[in-house]
Amino acid sequence: MNSAAVFALLDDASPDGQAHAQSRLYTDHAGTLTCHDAAGWNAVLAQMEAALARGQFAVPVLSYELGAHLLDIPAKPLTDMPLAQVLLFERCERMTAQQAASWVATRAVGTAPAGIADVRANVDEDRFVDAIDRIRDYIAAGDTYQVNYTYRLRFDAFGSVFALYERLRARQPVPYGALIGLPDGGALLSFSPELFVRHTAGTLLARPMKGTAPAGGDAEIDARRAADLALDTKNRAENLMIVDLLRNDLGRVAQTGTVAVPKLFEVTRFGAVLQMTSTVRAQLRPDATLAEIFAALYPCGSITGAPKRRTMEIIDELEPDPRGVYTGAIGWFDPPASGQAYGDFCLSVPIRTLSLGPGAGLRRGELGVGAGIVYDSDPQGEYAECRLKARFLTGLPNEFEIFETIKASWTDGPRHLDEHLARIGASCAYFGRAFDLDAARALVVDACLALPHEGVFRLRMASGADARLAVSSAPLAPLHEPVRVVLADSTVDSSDVFLRHKTAVRGRYDAAWRAAEAEGAFDALFFNERGELTEGGRSNVFVRIGGQWITPPLSCGLLPGVTRAVILQAPAWQAVEGIVTRAMLEEAEGIMVCNALRGPMLAV
């Protein structure tokens, strides 16, 4: 990624952030410090301090596994990120929450829809329950008092990261949000409500978070739920355990007698959840180094459990995959004032955090979610709490139609109905939308029975954002072969998720075939970014080369057309998939386009 694409927006969308310029935008990337083992950590800190002394700004992105390495206990290897990376910047601009929102909005405007699809967990409910049972055994044996057990949700993210962040920020406004463009082309979208530690002029402040309840938006109901959460014996016990752990951790670098707990069991609403926090404060020893501070505090006890070391060993045993930046740390370090060893800094605990891989049209994503487990935890209840915490992401609606166009007549009924139902059902499942196969079939059959007895018709079956199905019909006018095709002026990105599904997000395609139609042609053919033929705006395409019909593979970026599949499976056609370049198209012996309404048609 070029330096301009590396940035960090640390975004305070809380009410306090609305009133004061507490968000920070870091630009003019000056370099990245990394380490892949504990041996390199002190060098990273030393280089970071040197950069800060030069007046640069530092944004650390630290993995949970860094803590295990610092404690010299087992940790699963990271394959797609360093153990720690510190982004260095020349510029830091302070912003209000509204200014931060405007900065994101200007980069999200005019982009294609952004969202997530194909959400899947690396731990199912049975495995989750089994892990909780094993944790209870460890607690009974005296190994631990509380374990923060977590798992991962994997998904596909599509659209602009700015547009996706904008949508999620509206659902989960928090004081420790972050949108970070990473040097490898990946991105972090964090919506964390939890402070790990903040240093301000010698004072350390930690605000561990334990205790969750649903928030519904009704002020009176939420007030009752907040009061119940604040008084809940189990949640108070969990919270207090972590407060004691944080008091002990802070005490290792604090001036004697300065560790205090000014606030216990505060409840705050963040989006669809209520969270209980407590505040721990201490005065930092003047001689404490950054290395000592991290050794004492990292990782945050709220996302391990107590006691920290043994509990982290249990976590490594029970969790199947590394956590990465989830439950590690994200934050900022300011340059020191004259005479100071280091300046102010602030680190959040990156919960509710999306890690996105590199990519343009489609990125692989991961979200960690977990719960604090004590002996009397109810496994099913804890699993439900995890699902609640993830709802800000998993409940993000994909607000576009998914549809099929089907050739039908009163006499013959709908053509290839099973194939159409299978395709729309697969698309609905991918985009997280309910789909009733039997209801869809009945709607189409009823629509056919209502058609005039003469003529051929186009049925359009659509699933709306609310998952409701609707079917409409229109007469299908005849066409005469061969049809004419033209070449589209623009190219497509083969990673664009909307090329693989029939949705209403097809403005470029509709404009292309309509422009072609205005010139007397049937369709416009597209090429992708690699110069490979893909499809038409409303048809798949086959070319005849050396006596063989060839159609581009789906990996080129195209719709898995119903008629395309029929032709590939039909022995009479002897058609195969293959890459088709511009030169091959120009030399082709024949061209054939097809769709579900028209079937195969020779083209020129």
Task: Report the location of each language-model feature.
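Extended alpha-helical targeting/anchoring segments
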Residues: M1-I406, N528
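Helix-start/capping segments and mature chain N-termini
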Residues: N239, M276, G381-R458, A462-V604
